[in-house]
Each structure stands twice: as structure tokens, then as C-alpha cells.
Amino acid sequence: MRFTFLLYLCSCYVTINHFIMKQFFKMTFATVCGIAIFLVVTGFFLTISLLGMVASDSASTKVKDNSVFVIKLNGNIEERASAGSPLDELLGVDEISTIGLDDVISAIRKAKDNEDIKGIYLEGGSLGFDAPATAQQLRDALKDFKKSGKWIVASANQYHQVSYYVASVADNIYLNDHGAIDLRGLGGKREYYKGLYDKLGIKYMAAKVGKYKSYVESNTLTGMSDYDREQRTAYQNGIWNYMLKEMAESRKVKAEALNQLANDSIMAFADPNDYVKARLIDKVIFPEEIKAEIKKRLKIDKDDDIHQLTLSDMLNVKSEKDDDGDKIAIYYAYGSIVDSETINKLQGGGHSIVGKTTAEDLRKLADDDDVKAVVFRVNSGGGSAVASEQIRHAVKLLKAKKPVVVSMGGAAASGGYWISSPANYIVAEPTTITGSIGIFGLIPNFSGLVTDKLGVTFDGVKTNKFSDYDEELILGKNPDEIMKYMQTYVDKGYQQFLTIVSEGRGIKPAEVDSIGQGRVWLASDALKIKLVDKLGSLDDAVKKAAELAKLKEYHCETYPNKGSWIDQFMPDEDKGSYLDSQLHKEFKALLGDLYEPLMEIRQTVKEGSRMQARMLDDVRVK
């Protein structure tokens, strides 16, 4: 209670008290009313949804001859989206704001194999990606679609850079008369809060191993360290060069020419006709002309309707999937690695890898005699070292019974690499971010604020020297001695990490240390230093798993089940609930610009006494 009160005082110090309290009660009242209404109508919606589930289970999309699959490059795309509500279909909702990479790739493959689907239309150009490798995998799937001899047409009012990278695979790219392409190269700025904390009297203390382990720097420095600049420059240049090469091949221009366009001018403000001259697009076109272009490809009259299929439609198209042969399990582990998902949801975090839950799932796969091999799909920048070790141990036990092949997604770094290292074989996408072999602990000390500025002092008794070490760390004036023990604890954790990688990858500990030190690596570079075995896709990982298990005929099943949309509302001991995430939204609106630093404080207070195996905190491209 005392520490909670002190955190409240911290918040009051950095905000205007009257405004905060007024807004708090207003929003609390609105939240209570919203929850009451939610409880009243839930029963009604559940009834309708159950009827919708029955209807959707018994029906599938019928594909008409001469159809077009429309993929809208808007919203966001991530590793795996949660199951949608049956109400979507009943209410005629055909837009999916968050797209699962697994879903869209599955739909593209269905379209490739379906004779009635003649092509794909990519509409829009502002799709957000959780990682560079996610965009690369979507583009690769579209590239594979074209091998069937079918066409792809793309059109947008404007193209964000990474969406253009995806769309560049199309046979023809069209742009609105007043459209723009935001081609400018990769880059961005990171926030550093030390100056703010200095003014508040808050000091962050870091215990870490790894000169490249930069996660702590946003709280301990006022600018980027040379080591962090080095690693960020390396992986961003690698990703950008890969994107340039792919775009240049598709658009039949030189990569150097594209780079020059991004380097010499702000393409977002260019005249659309300049894009045609630069061969970035094929034609400046008005929206109503798109249909005419597609009808020409379909060889239908201008008055005929185009049979369109959305992503939702394609997901409901029956697959020609063959369930014969042995089973290979594909287990998805994506998001931050946590001990409990409740805290993550309260802070507005996305999907998480819960240590205990994931370890239990992997043990079940180990005991399932029907599963002959496992592909462990990892897309994580790490998190709790304790949870990471739980999962790693489960992977090791699984490997003792059947082959385990890791398929790395957008990132498999720090804790993500920790849980990957015991596998028989590691396959990574060319633009996967991996490595980050390092450990840290991060503790905020509030004595400068609470004692020096607010006048709160502390006194007490104890039976032993360090009985109150946790309070001394956070509120004491001289926590240096305790931090020495904290550093020793982190040092041991790093040595454990080195041993884990050494045993898993067959590399000497000294060599692991030389390529470790918290440094992130692009997968194409990680291949050269033996952190991964092959650059390839999830399909390549499945083929390798079948090879190791000596399977001639096999089929794949995905785990864990996505669960129904109803599950999102139900509280769980480890996973939290929908209402938890709603509380986060209320606090974010209340705190405004102060939300990020205060949530950082909250998280480090919660996790600071534990080792963290977490990579640098922002690897998105835009």
C-alpha cells in the first residue's frame, strides 16, 4: 500500500492534480456505465453469436468462375490474428482491421490453387507491419502466387513505403491522380527519458551484461550510444538493401536508381507523373478506371459485375487440404515473453507468450504420439528470463522425443533466441532480427522525488542487513551496494545464456560471447556466425522437420488453438481479460503524453527485480 501511494504521489507531481481528479472521476463513471451496459447486452449477443457459429460451420464460400481475390492493404498485419466474431458475418462486416499473416498467406495459396480465381487485386497502401520480415513474407507469398501464371494488380491513393514494397510485386501498379509514394529509406528516432526523470528526481539504475544491450538506454541516457548506433545502422541498412533489391527486380530498374530517388528527393511530394517516369508505377489513374482495367484482364464486358472475394470470404473457402499421413505440429509463439499476461494486457500489450502455459503446451505435444515432429514458430523480442527458461526447458524435453525445427518470424531475439536455441535446426527469414544474447535488470529509484522534493522520509527496524533491500533499491539514498549484488545476479544469468546457446548451437562459450554482448543481428548475417542454419520460410522449416522425422507423407496442424472471440472476454489466471485491456485505454486517455514514461516506471517496478532477456525496443519499419 505504501509504495502504491508513493507512485500516486509521483503521478500527482508531474500532472495538475485538479485536472487529473476531475478527468479520473468522469472517466471512471463512464467506464462503470459502459461495463453495466456491456453486461446487460452480452447475453443477447452471445445468443446471436451462437446461432452465427452454427450457420458459419455449416456453410462455406462458393467461388464463382472468373473471380478476383481482393486484398486490402490497410489496417495492421501481425503474426496471427485472433478469431473473429460470428457477428461480423451476420452484420455484413467484410473489413478486417488486424490481419493475421497466417490467414492471408493461407488465403493466397487457396487463390493460387483455385481455377476459378483469375487474379489478385491489392487495394490501398497503408498497411502497418509488426516487423520487416512480416512484409517480406507477405510479398513472398504474392510472388509465389504469380508462378501459377495468374496476375496481380495494385492500386492506391497513396503508398506508405513498406506497403509499396509489398505492392511492387504486382504486374501493374496504379496510383490516384493526386496520390503519393512515401519512398525515403528507413530510419526514425527513439525517445530518451533521462532528462525528464532528472527533473522529477527519478534515477534509473541498470545492471546489464552486453555493450550492445540497449533496451535500458532510453531510461539511462539522453541519446543513442555508439554501440546501439552501430547495430541499428547495420540491420537497417541490411533490410533496406534487401527491399531495394526486391523492388528493383520487380519494377525492372536498378536498385541504385531507387536508392537515389529516396536519397535525393522527398518522393512523397513528387508529381504523380514523376512516379511513372521513375517506373515506380505504370499509370496515373482515377478510381473508376480500375474496374475497367480489371475487366479487361477478366475478358468480360464493361457492364458485367466483377466477382470479388474478400479475405473473410477466402478464409471460408474449403481447402483441398490433405489430412493423410503423419502429423507435424506448428506451434506459434509470438509476442513478449511474460510470466503472466494480466500485467501485459493492463499495459495495453498485444499477444504474449506466457511461460507456464507455453511450457505445458509443449509438454503435451511431446506426449502426443500422433505428432511426429514440431515446428516451433517464434516471433518474439524476448522478455522475462524466468519464463524464457521455462519454455527452453520444455523445448529441450520435446526435442528428446521428436525433431524440433524453429521457424523464426519477424524477430527471435534475446529471450526469443533463448527459447529457440535447443532446437535441432533453425530456419530464419532473410529479414528476421535475431541474436541479442544479453541480460539486464532495470530499477527506478524515487528517493530524489519522494524525499528531496516531496519531503517524505522513511525509518524502521530490521533483523538482517538486507531485510528491506527491495525498499532500499526503490526509495533509499544509498542503493549502490545492493546494485552490486544485482549486477552479480545478472552476470550469472548471462553466463547461463552463453552456456545455453553454446550447448544448443555447438559453439564454444567464448565464441558465443564474442557474437553476443546483446547485439542484434539480421538473419542473413546471423547465418554466417552459426546462430541460424538456413534462410527460408515456414514451409522450409516444415520440410526440414519432415526430413528429420523421416516422413514421406505428412500434414500440418497449428497450435495453440486461436480460441473463440468469447474467450477474449473471459478472465484467466495467466491471460487476463478484455476488461483489463479496456482499463489500459482509460488510463492512456487520462495521462496523455505522460502515459509512456509512467507505464515504463510501472513495468520496471513490477519486473525490475527479475532478469530480462529483451532486445532493443523498436524494430518496426515505416
Regions found by a protein language model. Give the residues of each.
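Cysteine-centered motifs
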Residues: C10-C12
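Flexible, low-complexity junctional segments that flank or bridge functional domains
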Residues: K22-V70, E79, D113, K118, ...
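Cleft-lining beta-strand/loop regions that shape enzyme active-site pockets
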Residues: S60, S67-R190, K199, K321-L449, ...
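Charged, glycine-interspersed solvent-exposed loop segments at helix/strand-loop junctions
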Residues: R190, K194-E293, S447-I529, D533-K534, ...
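C-terminal long alpha-helix characteristic of the crotonase
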Residues: E249-S250, D282-K327, F440, L498-G504, ...
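Intrinsic disorder and flexible/low-complexity segments
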Residues: G325-I328, Y332-D368, Y489, N561-K622
